[in-house]
Amino acid sequence: MFLLSRKESKLSYCLKASAVSFCSAGALTVIVDLLYGLPADGPDVGMTLVDVLGTVLVGPALETLLMTLILVLIAKFTDRIFLSACLCAFIFSVLHSMSHPLWGMFTFMPFVVFGVAFQVWRQSSPKVGFTIAFLIHALHNSYVLLVGMLGQ
């Protein structure tokens, strides 16, 4: 599985991993919508330039920083990459659910991808691990914004 390997270029890894994170969340969104319908009271998607920058740059930077701290803490108890990523993703799912209940469900898999990426690339250096996870997260959020804009 490419997520566990550092054999390809960082750019290729980021593009592939962001596609995996986006498609996994998107597939779950479509399934939930088809089976149950998404609620009309979803999050407000009206965006200013500041909102876009916050969604694509600031939010991912802050969340990735917090994620790295949580993963470093979890690493004190286990060295299992997927377990650590899933525990961390669960924490972020709960946090996102506080904003809107369904967000937590839709953010779990992307945060597993971000968490795995950080841990794999952290073996090069913590800075590289952070940068890769941040870029994947920023790309993921960019795709979400683009799809949201196309859907309006």
Map each language-model feature to its residues.
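Intrinsic low-complexity, intrinsically disordered segments enriched in polar/basic residues
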Residues: M1-K10, K16, F118, G151-Q152
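Helix-boundary and loop/linker segments of multi-pass membrane transporters
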Residues: F2-K7, A40-T48, F77-D79, W121-Q123
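N-terminal signal-anchor transmembrane alpha helix
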Residues: E8-D33
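Membrane-interface helix-loop junction between the first two transmembrane segments
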Residues: I31-P43
